[in-house]
Swiss-Prot record:
Cofactor: FMN
Annotated localization: Cell membrane
Binding site for FMN: A59, G60, L61, D62, K63, T83, N136, N169, K214, T242, G265, G294, Y315, S316
Signal peptide: none
Pathway membership: Pyrimidine metabolism; UMP biosynthesis via de novo pathway; orotate from (S)-dihydroorotate (quinone route): step 1/1
Mode of membrane association: Peripheral membrane protein
Protein function: Catalyzes the conversion of dihydroorotate to orotate with quinone as electron acceptor.
GO cellular component annotations of the record: cytoplasm; plasma membrane
The name this protein goes by in its record: Dihydroorotate dehydrogenase (quinone)
Catalyzed reactions: (S)-dihydroorotate + a quinone = orotate + a quinol
Binding site residues for substrate: K63, N108, R109, M110, G111, F112, N169, N174, N243, T244
Similarity comment: family membership: Belongs to the dihydroorotate dehydrogenase family. Type 2 subfamily.
Self-association state and partner proteins as the record states: Monomer.
Length: 350
């Protein structure tokens, strides 16, 4: 209800300004209110972690972990913050975020703007939240692609003790050449080094923190199969499908469609769900899938589970629907496995 009142004001502002105001409000309420208790509804165990419900926040909304406690009050089963890089960086010049309300979409070319991993670590330490927290890591824009692994390892070292799981983001279209890391040889090298460091850190801290990989929707079937093979080969703990798309076929003729950057929201739903389904078939249950991309209602969340996901994440849908989307998705995915109405993954992207 409150969001329905606030939305016209927020939509009258530049999208990034509205984003900053929303984060500031969440930060304020998180500080002045007591710690939130996660909403328990059909809890599920995934990657050795206990999720109170299947609905999470996707990375990108709170890059620096500044509003963790406020976000925790919205009913999520888990939060993912970031993407964070080893050193602070400003990202791309403004304007770099655009609303496409006719199709309930967003285009962004933020470019991993963030305050650096040390600032995020300080914010996480200061937070009251004790639920499941994923931390999404990336590389600095000026780090050569052949040295990208060094940036991921530097971030992993610093966030490991604080994260419930760590996501390796190799799929943003807004960092030059980043998606090259989805290539077969590049991915093998990166995952091999990350897995070795994960084991070292687990021994050092006495705690195993799962690693997930976030991939793009703009992949050929053979590429998805190769990625699935690499995930199994390196015993990665999970995969997030998907990031934003560079495709524009669903938004032709829409204002701002020509803007460079990643497209999220409703137009990416079909392609993203097809990747989830293909991963599900290729992985055959060997590791869990966290689905993100175009979830605007409870039916969308259920469709992701039907395609083979264990958990789902939302972000762009929050911009158009507000926090009520979270409760709707939680209700829609409760008792999903026992509902008897689930489609099989063969229904998507066959």
């Amino acid at each position: 209800m409150l969001y329905n009142i606030a939305r016209p004001l927020l939509f009258s502002l530049d999208p990034e300004t509205a984003h900053e105001l929303s984060l500031a409000a969440l930060h304020f309420f998180g500080r002045v209110l007591p710690a939130a208790t996660p909403t328990e509804s059909d809890p599920v165990d995934v990657m050795g972690l206990h999720f109170p419900n299947r609905i999470g926040l996707a990375a990108g909304l709170d890059k620096n972990g500044e509003a963790i406690d406020g976000l925790a009050r919205l009913g999520f089963g888990f939060l993912e913050i970031g993407t964070i890089t080893p050193r602070p960086q400003p990202g791309n010049p403004r304007p770099r975020m655009f609303r496409l309300p006719e199709v309930r979409a967003i285009i962004n070319r933020m470019g991993f703007n963030n305050h650096g991993v040390d600032a995020l670590v300080a914010n996480v330490r200061a937070a009251k939240y004790r639920g499941i927290l994923g931390i999404n890591i990336g590389k600095n824009f000026d780090t050569p692609i052949d040295r990208a692994a060094d940036d991921y390892l530097a971030c992993l070292d610093k966030v490991y003790a604080l994260a419930s799981y760590v996501t390796v983001n190799i799929s943003s279209p807004n960092t030059k050449n980043l998606r090259q890391l989805q290539g077969e040889s590049e991915l093998d090298d990166l995952l091999g080094r990350l897995k070795a460091r994960q084991q070292q850190l687990a021994d050092r801290h006495g705690r195993y923190v799962p690693l997930t990989l976030k991939i793009a929707p703009d992949l050929e079937p053979a590429q998805v199969t190769n990625i699935a093979d690499a995930l199994r080969r390196h015993r990665i703990d999970g995969v997030i499908a998907t990031n934003t798309t560079i495709a524009r076929d669903k938004v032709q003729g829409v204002r701002y469609a020509e803007q460079q950057g990643g497209l999220s929201g409703a137009p990416v739903f079909e392609a993203s769900t097809a990747v989830v389904a293909q991963l599900s078939r290729a992985l055959a249950g060997e590791l869990p899938i966290i689905a993100a991309g175009g979830i605007l209602d409870g039916r969308g969340a259920r469709a992701k589970l039907a395609a083979g996901a264990s958990l789902v994440q939302v972000y762009s849908g929050l911009i158009y629907r507000g926090p009520s989307l979270i409760a709707e998705c939680v209700r829609a995915t409760t008792d999903f496995a026992d509902s008897g109405h689930a489609a099989t993954s063969a229904s998507f992207g066959a």
